[in-house]
Amino acid sequence: SHISDHMLTTIHDPYGWLTQESLYDITMTSAINALKHGTTTVENSTILPDTAYEAMDTSGIRGILAPQMASSFRLDSDPLNWKQALEKTKSCIEHYHNPKRRMSVAVHIHDLWDCMEKLMDGALELAEQYDTRFVTHFWEFQNAVERADEMWRDDGGAFSHYMKRGLITSRSVLFHGSMLREPEIEAIAGTGASIIHNPDINGTNCGNCAYVPYMLKNGINVGLGSDYGSLDAMSAMKLMLIVHNIMPRAERVLPYQAPFYAATMGSARAYGLDQEIGSIEPGKKADIITIDLKKAPH
């Protein structure tokens, strides 16, 4: 997939049309959809974060708010420059970050290909200052990786460049990772960073699939996401189990427990919430939804 196509079809025009009212409605509908399909905690990477927080808080869902920051494009609906975006994220952390209650706030740069390195560095410093997660889309599109490798050829390629800059750490949560090769997966395993697998979108939007069996073999913590609020974790678990049985790679097949673990403890660990949620045991939050399996569409 080409970045220009992605920008025009899923980010620039659609995001630019959003109003506070429509974003509130989308956020609320997404939360209801998540609850309907058994999900009690959602991470929301979003523009207009104050509006998104209001909807998430009203819905009653446990949430991780991740105000979106980028520097290579500006939106009519959220026209912040990169310095203002950092200040907005800081404000959200100071006003909304309260994991013991229900809401966490993560520091979110949209992707490495649409953020200046000043913004990347400032975002990581902010995450370290407030001891919260640093999250980003990562190695999702072939076209983006090829362009980045060309840009940082003298530094050993893009992955080597970003590793040297210290952007991948134990507080990093990397969305997708679907273009990561074996040596890069091994390097990430040594940092303690987590990867969030999104099998639906990898297949439909990117035409690829993260090498999850190799990630797990190397000890990377893998969480599971649906990427879009209109999708659901149940379908993502099913797809995660199926797709890795048929990918033509040396490491194939996942244990049947792996998708469930990724959707629960894997995701909780990724966001530093595994002492509070992710499993049913004494002392943890009782985030429980019951589902009638006779009626469930999954």
Predicted region positions:
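Alpha-helical scaffold segments that flank or form the walls of functional sites
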Residues: 2-61, 85-99
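A conserved active-site cap/scaffold subdomain adjacent to cofactor or substrate pockets
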Residues: 180-183, 189-221
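Active-site glycine- and acidic-residue-rich loops that bind
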Residues: 43-46, 106-122, 203-206, 270-272
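His/Asp/Glu-enriched, well-ordered alpha-helical/loop segment
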Residues: 164-171, 211-295
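Metal-coordinating catalytic core of metallo-dependent amide/deamination hydrolases
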Residues: 51-178, 183
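Short, acidic/turn-prone active-site loops that include or flank metal/cofactor-
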Residues: 67-72, 140, 199-204, 227-229
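A structural motif
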Residues: 39, 61, 131, 192-193
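Short catalytic-loop micro-motif centered on adjacent basic/acidic residues
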Residues: 40-44, 106-109, 173-175, 196-198, ...
